């Protein structure tokens, strides 16, 4: 049985994707909050507004992309399941292999 091919890649969202996100954030319409400061009746509208504002004005995707791309990213297909991994060689005379994984599909970082 052969090993699956490791395909190197860099994270690079198209600018059109980021432009689309900026447009959607700018067009966000918020429902009335109904004084839900304690989150007792669901999501807090003030928090959602602040979060949306942060994503629209302050979050720098390209800086995050550069930070993520400081690592060596690879993809592979394992029995039809796409896998994203980072391979970082250990240092020192006897490095120990370590596998870190997450349980939510398609998430990273």
Regions found by a protein language model. Name each.
Residues 7-8, 34-37, 97, 101:
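Residues at structural and domain junctions
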Residues 6-8, 71-73, 82, 95-96:
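Extracellular structured ligand-interaction cores
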Residues 1, 89-91:
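Short boundary motifs at domain starts and secondary-structure transition points
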Residues 17-87:
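Non-catalytic accessory segments flanking enzyme active sites
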Residues 91-109:
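Conserved HGGG/HGGXW glycine-rich cap/lid loop of the alpha/beta-hydrolase fold
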Residues 11-15:
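A short beta-loop-alpha structural element at the N-terminal edge
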Residues 1-8, 28-34:
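Short, contiguous pre-domain boundary segments
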């Amino acid at each position: 049985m052969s090993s699956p091919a490791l395909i190197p890649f860099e994270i690079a969202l198209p600018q059109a994707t980021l432009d689309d996100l900026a447009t959607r954030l700018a067009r966000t319409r918020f429902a009335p909050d109904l004084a839900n400061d304690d989150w007792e009746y669901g999501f807090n509208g003030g928090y959602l507004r602040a979060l949306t504002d942060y994503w629209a004005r302050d979050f720098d995707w390209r800086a995050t992309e550069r930070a993520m791309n400081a690592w060596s990213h690879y993809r592979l297909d394992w029995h039809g399941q796409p896998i994203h991994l980072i391979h970082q060689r250990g240092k020192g005379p006897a490095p120990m292999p370590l596998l870190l994984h997450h349980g939510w599909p398609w998430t990273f970082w």
